[in-house]
C-alpha cells in the first residue's frame, strides 16, 4: 500500500494478461484505476516525484504486453468512462468503451460514428491510434481532446494540432495522454444508422476471428497492398508458433489458441514479416504496439 495514494484502487504485482485482449502479459508493479482526474493527477505527480515510470494502458485491444510485465505504474481508465451529449457534440472520457459510445450516438440518432461500431477498445486508444474501419476514422469526426502531459498538467489539443495520419496522431510522439475527447456528429435517421451498424458488424463477424483472443489487426496496410492478402499468398494462414497462430479466417489477425505468450506473438510477427518480404518484396509494418519487458 502506498500511503500517499490512499483511497485510490491500486493493485500490486497484478498480472496484465487478465486485462489484455490477447490474454498475455506479465505483472504490473502497480496497476491503478483512478475514478476521476484528481486521482489520475495524484498518481502521476507521485510517480514523477518518486522517479517511477508510468503509462496508460487504455483497453489494451491493439496491444501486446511482454511476459516480463511493466515496471512502475500502469494506469487503466476503466472508471473514467462518462459520455455526454451537447447538441450534436459528443464528449467521452478516455475509458469509455468505443463500441458502447457508438451505440449512444445511435440511440440519439446521431450519425458519423457508425464506422467504429465493431472496433474494440477505448475512446482514448482510438484517438491515440486514429482508429478506423470501412472508410471511416476518428480524425473525420474529432474536434478536440483534453490530455495529461508527462508533468501532470491538463491541456486541450485541437484537431489541427493532432496531426492525424493513417493510424497516427501527434500524441504518439509527445507522450501526452488523452483523458477525454469531443466529436462532431450530425443528425441522422435512427433506422438508417442502425442498419449501417448491423451491416458493418455482420461483415466483421464474417471476416474476423472474433471468437479467439487477439490484438486485432496486426499490421498496417502497406501502400498498394493488403497485409492479409500478402500473408495469405505467402502460405502463412494457420502457421503457428507456440500457442499463437495466423488466423485461417483472416490472415491479418493472429489469435491465441492455446495459452500463448507474448513471446509467441513477437516470434510469429517477426516470422511473418520475414517470410512475406522474401515472398513479395513488401516489408510489413506492425500496427500493434508492443510494450513491457521480456522474461
From Swiss-Prot:
Show which residues constitute the signal peptide: none
The primary location reported for this protein is cytoplasm
The coiled-coil segments of this chain are: none
Could you provide one GO biological process annotation from this protein's UniProt record? cell wall organization
Localization terms from the record: Cytoplasm
**What are the EC numbers?**
1.3.1.98
Give the protein's function. Cell wall formation.
Protein known as: UDP-N-acetylenolpyruvoylglucosamine reductase
Q: Which organism is it from?
A: Streptococcus pyogenes serotype M3 (strain ATCC BAA-595 / MGAS315)
- What taxonomic classification does the UniProt entry list for its organism? Bacteria, Bacillati, Bacillota, Bacilli, Lactobacillales
